[in-house]
Amino acid sequence: MNSAFRILYECDQYRLYSIYENVYLKNIHRSESDNDIIVASVYGDPDSGLISFGNDYVAIAGCGITIHFLNGDEGYEIGTEADNVFWTEGIYQSGEDDFKYVRFTAYTDV
C-alpha cells in the first residue's frame, strides 16, 4: 500500500481518503477504483475530513476548509487563497449539532 494513503473518514456507504494533497471519495459498495471521485486538492495535505451524518456533504480541513456536496451542487473553499490562508485541523461533527454544522480548530500565523 502507498505510504501516502490516509483514510480520513469512513461510514456505511463511503470512504474518504487522501493520497498526498488529493482527497477522494469511494463508494465502498463498488470495488472498482475508477468509480472513486476526487473531491479536493489541499495544499500541504489534508489534516482531517468527515462525511456528514446524512451523507449530504464532505468537509475537509487543512489549508482552509473545503466543502463538497454529494448531490452535485457546487462546493466551496474558505481560507485557501494565497492572501487569506488559515490552517484548520480536527474537523468533526457532534451528535448534538444540526446536520448542517461542523466544528474545527483554526490556526493562522499572522
Give the ranges of each region predicted by the language model.
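Small/flexible residues
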Residues: L8, Y17, I28-E32
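Short coil turn/linker residues within repeat-based beta-strand modules
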Residues: R30-S33, G72-G75
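Repeated scaffold domains used in trafficking and secretory/extracellular systems
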Residues: M1-Y14, Y20, I37-N55, T80-F99, ...
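Extracytoplasmic/lumenal domain signature
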Residues: Y14, E32, R103-V110
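A short local loop/turn or secondary-structure capping micro-motif enriched for an aromatic residue
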Residues: I67-F69, Y76-E77, N84-F86
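Structural motif
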Residues: I19-N27, C63-N71, T108-V110
